[in-house]
């Protein structure tokens, strides 16, 4: 088992090698924002209870949350749990794109997280020595299917706690103002025709086709990870595999076509994308500046609700078409990269407190309603409340109609370093300072080199 000192040394060496930094000039700023987020969330976190309810745990919970967009909801839910049970719950939220960095740093401390998450098999490989075996726990027994369990041999080391979808969030009202409906978009060619027509009439219409494809650390994951999933998925489908140490790049021309469509038909010049943020993209969509916004079901509460400009009737989500496969029967990109893991190095009391908190979140009225209504989650547990999320409903409707969801194969990407290399190449390509060949090199050669490093570790 690795020691705290070993983790500290690993953090230092990985950061020195640039393995955990954001791409381009964003590394220092995103690392700084991660620290600020951690400090702010810690300060806002646990609350002492006045009248504890029944609980078997005498310990405390420290949850290192992956999702900044759900921070407020997690803080509120933690407070409710503490008020009901008397068990202190601290929620710390890492800044966007900085989870692994923050996790490495926090796990090196004496008061390390008791609850953290990994993104799938690749993430588990890095952290399995710290993961408590969840086999036989109450939360494991509440799963609707073992397919949501992350296993290493006979041990259940992670549990998927949310199923999500991503695609093209679409403002139906603006689309109709441009003379189209969602029924007009069933393929890449359809999407290209609509987007380029909107661009040609941009001054007349008063809006663009796509929000800015921001490539700073708060936004580039949408393209170096989520958009990159599409060519990986279709290559895996063609080759009949679910993982590889040597991606071929069969569909990288299609990746180029969709990325070109985004950056050449958006709210800003492609050369400006290096400095554009996730907030920029969201605000453009909120302000009716664009029809399409590539993002996921987790964005629902940022767009709909009190003080928000949209209702469910205004929005839907379309598949990300790249011109491959049976597009008429393609669904949204649906899956999970969110697996809860319990720190087995925590005290027995803290482990038990954490297990109780996890089970309460997915089984109690307060927990399940908060996860469905406040966070917009679909959770794979027996007591799940149906989510009001319009994007979740879109996924269900497509699946019921026989459309095939695109699997989340990005959990097989070899490393964060690989993602950052692809992100840097995409940013340079958009700015005109790099070529698409550089993207292909980062994608294919970078994959092979990172996979080799993993094999040698």
Language-model region placement:
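Extracytoplasmic/periplasmic substrate-recognition and gating elements
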Residues: 84, 178, 267, 307-373
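Extracytoplasmic "Venus flytrap"/periplasmic binding protein-like
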Residues: 80-145, 157, 173-179, 186, ...
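Conserved N-terminal structural module of periplasmic/extracytoplasmic solute-binding proteins
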Residues: 8-9, 24-123, 139, 274, ...
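A structural signal for short loop-to-beta-strand junctions that line the ligand-binding cleft
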Residues: 106, 113-114, 140-175, 206-208, ...
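Conserved C-terminal helix/tail region of periplasmic/extracytoplasmic solute-binding proteins
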Residues: 176, 200, 366-368, 383-387, ...
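Glycine-centered hinge/linker elements that transmit conformational signals in sensory
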Residues: 195-196, 241-275
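Hinge/lid segment of periplasmic solute-binding proteins
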Residues: 50-55, 119-167, 222, 226, ...
């Amino acid at each position: 088992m690795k020691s705290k000192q070993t983790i500290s040394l690993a953090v230092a060496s990985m950061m020195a090698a640039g393995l955990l930094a954001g791409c381009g000039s964003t590394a220092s700023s995103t690392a700084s924002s991660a620290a600020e987020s951690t400090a702010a969330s810690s300060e806002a976190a646990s609350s002492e209870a006045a009248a504890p309810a029944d609980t078997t745990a005498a310990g405390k919970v420290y949850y290192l949350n992956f999702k900044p967009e759900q921070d407020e909801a997690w803080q509120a839910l933690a407070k409710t749990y503490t008020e009901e049970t008397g068990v202190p719950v601290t929620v710390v939220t890492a800044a966007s794109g900085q989870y692994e960095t923050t996790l490495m740093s926090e796990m090196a401390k004496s008061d390390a997280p008791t609850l953290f998450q990994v993104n799938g098999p690749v993430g588990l490989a890095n952290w399995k020595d710290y993961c408590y075996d969840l086999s036989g726990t109450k939360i494991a027994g509440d799963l609707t299917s073992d397919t949501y369990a992350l296993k290493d041999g006979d041990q259940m080391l992670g549990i998927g706690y949310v199923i999500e979808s991503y695609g093209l969030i679409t403002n139906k009202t603006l689309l109709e103002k441009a003379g189209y409906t969602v029924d007009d978009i069933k393929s890449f060619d359809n999407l290209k025709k609509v987007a380029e027509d909107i661009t040609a009439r941009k001054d007349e219409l008063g809006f663009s086709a796509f929000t800015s494809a921001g490539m700073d650390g708060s936004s580039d994951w949408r393209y170096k990870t989520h958009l990159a999933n599409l060519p990986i998925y279709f290559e895996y489908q063609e080759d009949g595999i679910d993982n590889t140490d040597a991606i071929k790049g069969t569909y990288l021309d299609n990746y180029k076509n969709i990325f070109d469509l985004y950056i050449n038909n958006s709210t800003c010049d492609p050369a400006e994308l290096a400095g554009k943020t996730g907030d920029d993209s969201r605000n453009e969509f909120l302000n009716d500046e664009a029809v399409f916004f590539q993002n996921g079901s987790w964005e629902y509460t940022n767009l709909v609700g009190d003080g928000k400009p949209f209702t469910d009737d205004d929005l839907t989500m379309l598949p990300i078409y790249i011109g491959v496969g049976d597009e008429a029967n393609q669904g949204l990109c649906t899956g999970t990269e969110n697996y809860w893991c319990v720190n087995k190095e925590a005290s027995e009391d803290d482990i038990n407190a954490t297990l109780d908190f996890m089970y309460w979140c997915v089984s109690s009225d307060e927990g399940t309603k908060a996860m469905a209504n406040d966070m917009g989650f679909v959770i794979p547990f027996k007591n799940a409340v149906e989510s009001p999320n319009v994007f979740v409903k879109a996924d269900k409707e497509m699946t019921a109609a026989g459309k095939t969801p695109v699997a989340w194969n990005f959990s097989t990407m070899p490393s964060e370093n690989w993602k950052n290399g692809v992100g840097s190449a995409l940013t340079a390509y958009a700015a005109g300072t790099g070529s698409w060949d550089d993207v292909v090199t980062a994608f294919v050669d970078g994959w092979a080199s990172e996979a080799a490093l993993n094999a040698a570790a």
